[in-house]
Amino acid sequence: MRLVLASQSPSRLSILRGAGVEPVIAPAHVDERAIEERLAGAEPAEIVCALAAAKAEAIAPDYPEDVVVGGDSMLLLDGSLQGKPHTPEATVERWHAQAGRAAELITGHCVLYGEERFVEASRTTVHFAQASDADIEAYARTGEPLECAGAFTLEALGGWFIDRIEGDPSSVIGLSLPVLRRALYSFGLNVSEFWAQH
């Protein structure tokens, strides 16, 4: 039995590897925009969980004996969900809006094991620094935040511009280890079953 990650996110992979798990990488290709449009007006946690579920469900038939994990993160700022900025210009715009403020990073998780299903969202408050314009522009030019929810990373260059977080750090990076542990326990599995042999 293996843990299969329905994502090509380097951050999610690094969380699992750092926690002793060498997952199978099986990126799911889903129409995220269509799901977001279908759920327009829904609660933020419902949206990120639906996106996580779509990813896990897309690949689960190929891994019937394994545990499949899907995840999706978005930043909630001023009542609006912010996904990935995709461009340096959008990154700079996002940072001007969130610098010096607090926002909520919501990560949806969907964990599948055979016919069993565990879905949970985790919420972490992120306090953004009042970064200088020069640093915001330089950060955007690196390309690092372009494919990250909220236009930042906690574990790399973006860490310079985060004053503090309240909640689970692994959730901010892309997958909550406490949520995954609860999912595995709900299936009658132990975390240590997935640790790579040393």
UniProtKB/Swiss-Prot annotation:
Enzymatic reactions: a ribonucleoside 5'-triphosphate + H2O = a ribonucleoside 5'-phosphate + diphosphate + H(+); a 2'-deoxyribonucleoside 5'-triphosphate + H2O = a 2'-deoxyribonucleoside 5'-phosphate + diphosphate + H(+)
Keyword flag Hydrolase: yes
Biological process (GO), any one: nucleotide metabolic process
Compartments (UniProt record): Cytoplasm
Coiled-coil segments: none
InterPro entries xref list: ITPase-like_fam, Maf-like
Superkingdom field: Bacteria
Cofactor (UniProt): a divalent metal cation
Organismal lineage: Bacteria, Bacillati, Actinomycetota, Actinomycetes, Mycobacteriales
Keyword list, A-Z: Cytoplasm, Hydrolase, Nucleotide metabolism
EC number(s) from the headed UniProt entry: 3.6.1.9
Family: Belongs to the Maf family.
Signal peptide: none
Main function: Nucleoside triphosphate pyrophosphatase. May have a dual role in cell division arrest and in preventing the incorporation of modified nucleotides into cellular nucleic acids.
Active site, per annotation: D72
Protein name: Nucleoside triphosphate pyrophosphatase
Listed GO MF terms: nucleoside triphosphate diphosphatase activity
GO cellular component, one term: cytoplasm
Alphabetized Pfam families for the sequence: Maf
Main location: cytoplasm
Claim: Cytoplasm is one of the keywords in the record: yes
